[in-house]
């Protein structure tokens, strides 16, 4: 096997080797290819990047060329438009008016065009020479094919070594020299920018006659045409030029330099156009844009990057010179070699050198102005006279016509002409002067402190003014216009580059006028009349001192005036705001007249001869003569100032008469107040506002009109504190006395009593609480009505006005009721007798506490005034409709009439005759009345909360009542108890009739609902105001938590079933109850009993109630102690900790809320140890059948009557149990229920507060209303015999122990 493998290896070894070599070669080749691909990729990407860069450069170059071409075409278009017009100005020397920059193409071309147009009558030089701009100027001429030798220093305008062309060379000689060539080819010579390439023609100035103008250089292109095409036209045109008068003069054409060799002569053809109008709207617009841009650059400078780039091409920028007097501005170009002066107008050398020597110069770059000191910037430099360059004498006529003449030397027509031509030469129409003035009038050279000579106002400002204003003095100046100014001042005046001083002043004044006109909308506020001149003389002081004293002369009729000068344009912002405020006041004075002090000052300044008419908006207003300040008297009507000696008049509007009446009334009222009287206007206002018999005499019987407060104080001692007689006293005492009298006067004549103030404060608090609680408007009126006492007949007779007592008052709610019943329906009202008893009891209780007192009629507050009849009726109707809507919605109105009939007649008469027993019953009024039977809990989803207003009032009455032992009278307690029982009966009836439930008013309300089967009460309120009083005997139900008797629990209803179903259910429940435990829940009678309580079936007479008393003073205490059954007390041992907590006033521990009792989760204290509470299968919500409710209630009240008559002499402490209950007890015993162990034990009196105490029922339970209360009013349940909220209790019907005890106590 090994030999075979070796053989195979020997034979196949070359194959393996070759294969390995091949793979290695492939790998190397792949790596090499990848490496080369990467390198190629990098090279490719670099190439793409370079291509993009090159493309961008090409695009930028083409874009720059296109932009340059467009920029070059704009001047060409401008010049073509200018040449197409026929404008022939009357003045020359316009170069300095357009631009100071010698390299500006537009201004140079425009200057030459204007000059040639001025000379067109003599020479007819063609403006076609100005066809193209300098940078793109093309020279088209027939030349030979030989090349030119360009000079690198060609077209150097700033060189002084330029040769001068002989002065005797004429146009014909040049033409003959150029037309010698016969064969020539058209060649295009392009003049490029000398700053970029440096290959230009070298041009030099030529000496000319006095009437000719010197060109700054050959900036215009010369068009040289082919001879074959233009020979005839050229000869004809040259002949015309020779015949013209201007052929003797020399043209501004400069020949080529000797370095330019021309082998073939060329023919020059100069073509001219007919003169046409020059300024068209488009030309004006372009010139305005150009000048505006140029002046903006001169003021603010070019952008930083543009300036830096220009500095590279212009290493020696021009330096500006300020003007002197009214001469135009020129400039100096400072070079490194020497200085040369170029002037574009003819000026004599003497004048020029005298002007240039010692003058400060200014740099060209605006950015350098703020870099150094002003002295360094404006450095003076001597300039040598250029001998090699002759300067011609100036044309004084042109200068005189162009520059504004001094004041007083020209008339109005010439001034108007100067204004027009100034705007024309500057390219600034009047519409554009505002924008330019805001740009360059505030240049660096112009300062607000600069003092300038006066000037004459132009014609367009002279319009008549509407009001006379004293003219403010302009800055003082030299008296003669020829007087020279100081050198620093001349340096400051020259800040405006191209306008003279007079032009600056004129334009600035125009801008001020336009600004004010636009701002105030007044077209002629500061205008001047054209026919007069101002006569203002000034006396000034030296420059370094304060401003000169001004002597003002005011103008007569028609004389001009003004309040503004050119200095106001340079004032700061705050001063400008003050000026605007002054103008506003001025406009107000125009309409309403001037103030008195201003009138007096004007009257002192104005003389009797300088008065003029004052139109006041076309309305004739009364004039008032100002003889004494503060006493204006009408003097008449008219529109002029009345010339009176020492007195002045001013236009006064019609409203001043009304203001005068108001001032007089105010003075009278102040005098009456100081005298201690009530002002007549106040009394009249009271008379007009108080209706009917509530007049001023009735309201204030003790305050006769016109009688001072001091006399009233003598008659009425109560007014001693209100009236303070004036006596000499100190300043502080006098101020205090006057302030006291003033305060009393400002108040109403009768102050409010303390009781009324307290009521108002209480009302305000209640309304605030109602607002915070989100109550509706229906309940916001309740607090004020509940706290205010009801007015009886005795109070009505003593009041000064009649108060109508309503027959049936509106339902009143206490603050707690208003808070608890937010969103609930209102309660029903009682009858008339009930309302009267409530009012009496409330008043008695309030008087017992000292809260009410009878106030004399004169001390009655104004707030107790009754409402008007309409207001009262509307309130009654609104409340009645709201109540009826709620009654209809909840179904109350049908059952209310059933209950009012027996309640209002029988129950009340019977309840009054019932004895109340011993005084211990009054103690139980604050305590909880016990229950004989316990109703079942209702369905929480169908519970409607209701609460009567009468019950709430009784609650507050009972809280305010003192203890029963402190009350000496028995009748008051009796009436209160009877009324309380009756109200409780009403409440129970309303609860049963509407399916509602009552909440306790004791503690703050809660919205927690009560569900059936809960082991504890979801809402256990207590009265927070009641506390445990030491030494006071407590009933069993009073656990230290407050008045449990005031607490309302849930009440149960019956289901809508007939009597047979109820009997079957009752029998079934009685059978099931014998098998259940002895503990019970809170809301149900027993856990195994149905929620249809059989006590609500009133077929049998009312039963007797097993009662016991807990008083420590009665003689029957021993009987009550012996009669206590011990088994229920023994059963109550299980919840003893809860009872001890309740007796100490501590809250009960609560368990989670349970929805159904069948869940088997009893609350704490319900089930004793070892017992369980099974669920009842019959537990369901119960309802009271509405069909038999009326008959059952009638039977119930009838049985109560019979029982009360038969038991009239029965002992109030005990009552026998009902027979039906006894029968039920016997049946339960016979069925085998466990008997209760009854070892009798005596209980000590202090055990009534312990957990083993037996509950007791007092004598008031004998009253019909209380029996009804005990039947239907839910009370705190008790475990065993102790009242514990939220714990189980023993039912006398289903608990065999109680039934057995009742049977043993009351044998049949």
Curated annotation (Swiss-Prot):
Domain of life the protein comes from: Eukaryota
Subcellular location: Membrane
Organism: Mus musculus
Regions crossing the membrane: 7-27
Entry similarity comment: Belongs to the SPATA31 family.
Statement: the UniProt record of this protein carries the keyword Transmembrane: yes
Amino acid composition bias (Pro residues), ranges on this chain: 465-478
Gene name per UniProt: Spata31f1b
Keyword Nucleotide-binding among UniProt keywords: no
Residue numbers spanned by region Disordered: 464-488, 627-648, 844-863, 902-927, 1005-1026, 1084-1190, 1204-1254
Major subcellular site: membrane
Protein keywords: Membrane, Transmembrane, Transmembrane helix
Record's protein name: Spermatogenesis-associated protein 31F1B
Biased segments, Acidic residues type: 1107-1117
Membrane topology: Single-pass membrane protein
């Amino acid at each position: 096997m090994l030999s075979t493998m070796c053989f195979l290896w020997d034979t196949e070894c070359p194959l393996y080797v070759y294969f390995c070599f091949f793979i290695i070669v492939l790998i190397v080749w792949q790596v090499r290819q990848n490496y080369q691909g990467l390198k190629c990729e990098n090279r490719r990407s670099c190439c793409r990047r370079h291509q993009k860069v090159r493309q961008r450069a090409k695009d930028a170059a083409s874009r720059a060329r296109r932009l340059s071409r467009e920029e070059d075409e704009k001047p060409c278009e401008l010049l073509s438009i200018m040449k197409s017009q026929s404008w022939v100005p009357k003045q020359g020397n316009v170069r300095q008016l357009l631009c100071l920059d010698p390299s500006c193409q537009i201004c140079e071309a425009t200057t030459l065009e204007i000059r040639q147009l001025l000379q067109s009558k003599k020479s007819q030089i063609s403006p076609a020479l100005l066809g193209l701009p300098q940078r793109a100027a093309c020279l088209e001429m027939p030349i030979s094919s030989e090349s030119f030798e360009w000079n690198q220093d060609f077209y150097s305008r700033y060189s002084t070594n330029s040769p001068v062309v002989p002065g005797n060379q004429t146009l014909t000689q040049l033409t003959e020299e150029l037309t010698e060539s016969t064969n020539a080819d058209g060649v295009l010579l392009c003049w490029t920018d000398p700053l970029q390439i440096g290959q230009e023609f070298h041009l030099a100035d030529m000496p000319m006659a006095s009437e000719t103008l010197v060109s700054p250089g050959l900036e215009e292109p010369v068009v040289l045409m082919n001879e074959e095409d233009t020979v005839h036209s050229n000869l004809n045109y040259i002949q015309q030029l020779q015949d013209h008068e201007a052929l003797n003069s020399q043209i501004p054409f400069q020949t080529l330099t000797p370095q330019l060799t021309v082998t073939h002569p060329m023919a020059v053809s100069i073509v001219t156009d007919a003169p046409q109008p020059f300024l068209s709207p488009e030309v004006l617009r372009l010139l305005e844009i150009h000048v505006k841009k140029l002046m903006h650059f001169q003021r603010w400078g070019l952008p930083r990057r543009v300036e830096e780039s220009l500095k590279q091409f212009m290493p020696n920028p021009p330096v500006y010179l300020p003007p002197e007097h009214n001469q135009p501005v020129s400039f100096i170009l400072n070079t490194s070699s020497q200085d040369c002066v170029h002037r574009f107008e003819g000026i004599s050398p003497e004048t020029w050198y005298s002007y240039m020597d010692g003058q400060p110069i200014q740099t060209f770059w605006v950015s350098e102005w703020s870099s150094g000191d002003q002295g360094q910037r404006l450095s003076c430099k001597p300039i040598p006279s250029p001998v090699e360059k002759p300067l011609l004498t100036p044309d004084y006529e042109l200068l005189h016509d162009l520059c504004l003449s001094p004041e007083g030397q020209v008339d109005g027509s010439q001034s108007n002409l100067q204004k027009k031509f100034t705007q024309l030469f500057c390219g600034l129409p009047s519409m554009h002067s505002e924008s330019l003035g805001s740009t360059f009038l505030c240049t660096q050279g112009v300062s607000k402190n600069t003092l300038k000579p006066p000037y004459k106002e132009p014609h367009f400002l002279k319009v008549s003014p509407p009001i006379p204003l004293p003219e403010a003095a302009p800055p003082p100046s030299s008296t003669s216009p020829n007087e020279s100014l100081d050198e620093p001042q001349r340096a400051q005046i020259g800040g405006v580059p191209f306008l003279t001083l007079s032009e600056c002043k004129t334009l600035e004044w125009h801008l001020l006028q336009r600004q004010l006109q636009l701002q105030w909308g007044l077209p002629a506020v500061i205008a001047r009349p054209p026919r007069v001149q101002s006569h203002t003389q000034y006396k000034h002081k030296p420059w370094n001192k304060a401003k000169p004293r001004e002597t003002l002369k005011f103008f007569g009729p028609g004389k001009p005036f003004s309040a503004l000068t050119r200095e106001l344009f340079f004032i700061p912002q705050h001063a400008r705001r003050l000026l605007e405020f002054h103008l506003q006041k001025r406009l107000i004075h125009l309409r309403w007249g001037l103030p008195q002090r201003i009138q007096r000052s004007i009257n002192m300044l104005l003389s009797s001869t300088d008065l003029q008419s004052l139109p006041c908006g076309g309305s004739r207003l009364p004039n008032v003569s100002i003889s004494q300040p503060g006493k204006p008297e009408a003097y008449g009507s008219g529109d002029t100032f009345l010339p009176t000696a020492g007195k002045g008049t001013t236009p006064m509007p019609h409203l001043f008469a009304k203001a005068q009446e108001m001032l007089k009334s105010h003075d009278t009222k102040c005098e009456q107040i100081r005298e201690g009287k009530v002002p007549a206007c106040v009394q009249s206002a009271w008379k007009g506002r108080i209706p009917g018999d509530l007049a001023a005499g009735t309201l204030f019987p003790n305050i006769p009109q016109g009688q001072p407060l001091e006399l009233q104080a003598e008659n009425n001692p109560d007014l001693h504190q209100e009236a303070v007689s004036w006596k000499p006293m100190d300043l502080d005492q006098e101020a205090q006395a006057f302030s006291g009298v003033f305060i009393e006067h400002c108040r109403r004549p009768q102050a409010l009593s303390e009781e009324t103030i307290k009521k108002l404060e209480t009302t305000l608090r209640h309304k605030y609480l109602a607002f915070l609680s989100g109550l509706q408007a229906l309940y916001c009126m309740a607090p004020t009505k509940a706290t205010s006492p009801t007015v009886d007949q005795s109070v009505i007779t003593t009041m000064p006005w009649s108060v109508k007592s309503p027959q049936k008052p509106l339902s009143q709610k206490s603050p707690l009721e208003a808070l608890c019943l937010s969103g609930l329906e209102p309660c029903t009202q009682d009858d008339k007798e009930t309302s009267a008893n409530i009012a009496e009891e409330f008043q008695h209780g309030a008087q017992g506490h000292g809260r009410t007192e009878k106030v004399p009629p004169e001390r009655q507050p104004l707030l107790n005034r009754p409402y008007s009849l309409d207001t009262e009726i509307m309130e009654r109707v609104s409340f009645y409709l709201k109540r009826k809507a709620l009654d209809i919605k909840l179904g109350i109105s049908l059952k209310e009439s059933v209950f009012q009939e027996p309640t209002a007649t029988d129950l009340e008469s019977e309840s009054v005759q019932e004895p109340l027993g011993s005084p211990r019953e009054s103690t139980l009024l604050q305590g909880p009345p016990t229950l004989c039977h316990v109703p079942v809990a209702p369905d929480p989803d169908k519970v409607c909360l209701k609460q009567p207003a009468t019950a709430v009032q009784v609650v507050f009455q009972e809280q305010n009542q003192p203890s029963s032992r402190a009350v000496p009278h028995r009748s008051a307690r009796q009436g209160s108890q009877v009324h309380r029982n009756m109200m409780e009966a009403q409440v129970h009836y309303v609860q049963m009739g509407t399916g509602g439930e009552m909440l306790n008013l004791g503690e703050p309300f809660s919205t927690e609902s009560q569900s059936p089967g809960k082991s504890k009460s979801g809402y256990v309120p207590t009265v927070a105001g009641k506390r445990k009083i030491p030494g006071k005997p407590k009933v069993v139900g009073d656990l230290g938590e407050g008045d449990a008797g005031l607490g309302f629990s849930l009440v149960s209803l019956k289901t809508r079933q007939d009597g047979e179903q109820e009997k079957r259910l009752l029998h079934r429940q009685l059978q099931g109850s014998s098998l259940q435990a002895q503990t019970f829940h809170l809301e149900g009678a027993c856990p195994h009993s149905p929620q249809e309580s059989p006590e609500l079936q009133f077929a049998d007479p009312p039963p007797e109630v097993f009662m016991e008393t807990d008083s420590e003073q009665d003689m029957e205490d021993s009987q009550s102690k012996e009669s206590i059954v011990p088994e229920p007390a023994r059963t109550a041992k299980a919840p003893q900790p809860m009872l001890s907590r309740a007796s100490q006033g501590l809250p009960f521990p609560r368990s989670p809320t349970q929805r159904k009792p069948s869940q088997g989760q009893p609350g704490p204290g319900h089930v004793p140890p070892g017992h369980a509470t099974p669920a009842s299968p019959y537990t369901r919500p119960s309802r009271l059948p509405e069909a038999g409710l009326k008959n059952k209630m009638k039977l119930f009240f009838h049985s109560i009557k019979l029982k009360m008559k038969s038991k009239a002499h029965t002992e109030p402490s005990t009552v026998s149990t009902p027979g039906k209950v006894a029968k039920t007890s016997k049946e339960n015993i016979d069925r085998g229920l466990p008997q209760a162990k009854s070892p009798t034990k005596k209980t000590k009196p202090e055990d009534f507060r312990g957990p083993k105490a037996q509950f007791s029922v007092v004598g008031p339970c004998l009253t019909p209303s209380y029996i009804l209360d005990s039947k239907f009013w839910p009370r705190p349940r008790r475990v065993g015999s102790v009242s514990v909220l939220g714990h189980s209790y023993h039912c006398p019907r289903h608990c065999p122990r109680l039934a057995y005890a009742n049977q043993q106590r009351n044998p049949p």
